Design a protein with these regions (language model features):
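Extended hydrophobic leader/signal-anchor segments used for secretion and membrane insertion
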Residues: 1-131
Length: 131
C-alpha cells in the first residue's frame, strides 16, 4: 500500500510541477540567436503580470490566431486597468510579432520564460556556425 501511495504522490507532484513550470519547445527562428528552433525552455506560471518588465521573455496566445508564441517584452502600457505589452522577436526578419498586430493584452499571457535547457549538440553546432 505504501508503494502505491508513493507512486501516486510522485505522479501528483510531477503533474503539479509540469503545470506550474511547463517545458516548452521553441518552434521557428523568431527568437534566434537567443533560442534555437527545437530547443527546450522552462516557463513559470508563478509570476505577477504587474512585475513583468522590458526584456522579459514571455509565452502568449497570438491575438491573430490560435498559436502560442514566444517573444521578448519591448514596451508596456496600462489602459483602463489592463496591462498591454509590445512584444518582439529577437530575429526581426523571421518574427511575426507586435510590429504586425500591435500591443498584446496581459490576458493572452501563458507564462514567463525562466530558464533554458540546450541540447549539447545544438550548442556545439551553434559554436561551429559562429566560428
Amino acid at each position: 500500500m505504501k508503494v502505491v501511495f508513493n507512486i501516486v504522490l510522485i505522479v501528483v507532484v510531477f503533474a503539479f510541477l509540469h503545470h506550474v513550470f511547463p517545458l516548452i519547445q521553441v518552434i521557428g527562428d523568431s527568437m534566434y540567436p537567443t533560442y534555437l528552433d527545437g530547443e527546450i525552455i522552462v516557463g513559470t506560471k508563478l509570476y505577477r503580470k504587474s512585475k513583468l518588465k522590458k526584456g522579459d521573455v514571455v509565452l502568449y496566445q497570438s491575438p491573430t490566431d490560435d498559436k502560442t508564441v514566444i517573444k521578448r517584452i519591448d514596451q508596456i502600457e496600462k489602459r483602463g486597468g489592463v496591462l498591454y505589452f509590445y512584444c518582439l522577436g529577437d530575429n526581426p526578419p523571421h518574427s511575426y510579432d507586435s510590429r504586425n498586430y500591435g500591443f498584446v493584452s496581459s490576458k493572452n499571457f501563458v507564462c514567463k520564460v525562466i530558464n533554458q535547457r540546450r541540447n549539447i549538440n545544438d550548442v556545439c553546432n551553434q559554436k561551429r556556425r559562429n566560428s
